[in-house]
């Protein structure tokens, strides 16, 4: 899988995803400035990083193309928890891997992780983050 694709700036909306400075981000706001007599319309895109939570913004012409991440949303089971990593097993492929707690676990679920529970995790651009706990 390519992990990213190209999309025209004019097609972007809040709630969608974009790659800014190599970091996948969720778009919070898109404002388009009307062009003057000569020139093209510009879009200001404000977004929040999926992994680090930092606010980023870019300004691009609406006719330009930007990279958009392909996010693979999967289900896994927590096998073990160490002080700095979580060992996760994919429920479809039964592949196991380690996810760092810092940056790899969403802040909302950090305190709720226990061994044996089922979680939803996102994989994009070679990085993994546990997003939420699944109810069985």
UniProtKB/Swiss-Prot annotation:
Belongs to the eIF-5A family. SMART domains: eIF-5a (SM01376). GO terms for cellular component: cytoplasm. One of its GO terms (molecular function) is translation initiation factor activity. This is Translation initiation factor 5A. The modification Hypusine is found at residue 37. The gene is eif5a. Keywords: Cytoplasm, Hypusine, Initiation factor, Protein biosynthesis. One of its GO terms (biological process) is translational elongation. It is found in: Cytoplasm.
């Amino acid at each position: 899988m390519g992990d990213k694709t190209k999309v025209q700036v004019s097609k972007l909306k809040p709630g969608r995803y974009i790659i800014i400075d190599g970091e996948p981000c969720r778009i919070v706001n898109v404002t388009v400035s009307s062009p003057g007599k000569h020139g093209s319309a510009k879009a200001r895109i404000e977004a929040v990083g999926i992994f680090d939570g930092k606010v980023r913004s870019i300004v691009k012409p609406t006719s330009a193309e930007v990279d958009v991440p392909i996010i693979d949303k999967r289900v896994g089971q927590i096998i073990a928890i160490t002080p700095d990593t979580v060992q996760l097993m994919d429920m479809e492929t039964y592949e196991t891997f380690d996810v760092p707690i810092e940056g790899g676990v969403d802040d909302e679920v950090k305190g709720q992780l226990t061994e044996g529970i089922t979680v939803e995790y996102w994989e994009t651009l070679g990085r993994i983050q546990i997003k939420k706990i699944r109810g069985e």
